[in-house]
Amino acid sequence: MAKIQIKSEKLTPFGGIFSIIEQFDSTLSSVIDSTLGLRCRSFGYRYSEIIRSLMSIYFSGGSCIEDVTTHLMNHLSLHPTLRTCSSDTILRAIKELTQENISYTSDTGKNYNFNTADTLNTLLLNCMFASGQLKEGETYDDFLYK
């Protein structure tokens, strides 16, 4: 015979998202905030909260940033400590983190634009060290198959 339980708490259709968010918070939030720095002094969202909101969109089957406001906000607000920001806040933070392109003109006169995204590349490396994907003192080769 099947056991039936009656739950009094509210449920979310995105089963498991809260455990993923809690794992993210325990592993990467402090790394993100220490790498990217303080975003605002009083009220507002930290960069880790903004990146977590962005991540939640895609882990919940969303396809655009606006999905956090239109579909997820009500469900993610069920978590007792989670602060989820709006799509406008996510877009402002992405703009804050951008860097200007660097232009290079070759000897033949051809112009090239590139972007080193130093801050975000540093964040990527710090997150990979924090999650154990890279080890301090190890050597890694990175190459591209074509």
Predicted regions and their residues:
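Dynamic "connector" segments at or just before major functional cores
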Residues: 1-146
